[in-house]
Amino acid sequence: QNFAGTKLKALFEACGLEHGDMDIYHRHEQSDTTSPVQFSVASAVEPGTFKPEDMPALSTPGISFFMSMPGPTNSMQAFEFMLETAQCVVRNLGGELKDERRSVMTPQTIEHCRQRIREFERKQRSPRQ
């Protein structure tokens, strides 16, 4: 079952995402689009874009949530917002939440993601050798 563009657009906007750069949706740290991006959402179908004028006719089998590090001021907070938004899509529109290897996300997978973020931030803070 595919996701309808109009339903995705309404849900993304309700979750505070803005259409922007690269024709995809982004969640910014502040309500203005000049603040750092916490995470982004793209269509799983090439080219991955969500053009506003195409949303009424859009139908996609999947969407990808992703974040870049370094990027957000608080990476863990950005991850939690991204996870909550992805879970909101599943609750409201169906589908399954999967990881970067396309395996179903479990509480253990989610905790592993958090550990990877903590490790990345620890390395960013440690003095360079």
Label the model's feature ranges.
Residues 65-129:
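Well-ordered alpha/beta subsegment
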Residues 53-60, 75:
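Internal insertion modules embedded within essential enzymes
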Residues 8-11, 17, 58, 83, ...:
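Generic detector of leucine side chains in alpha-helical contexts
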Residues 1, 12, 64-70:
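Short glycine-rich or small-residue beta-strand-to-loop segments that form or flank ligand, phosphate
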Residues 40-56, 115-127:
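A broadly tuned preference for mixed-charge, low-complexity surface segments
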Residues 23, 60-63:
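Short glycine-/polar-rich loops that comprise or flank the Walker A/P-loop
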Residues 1-53:
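Short, highly charged
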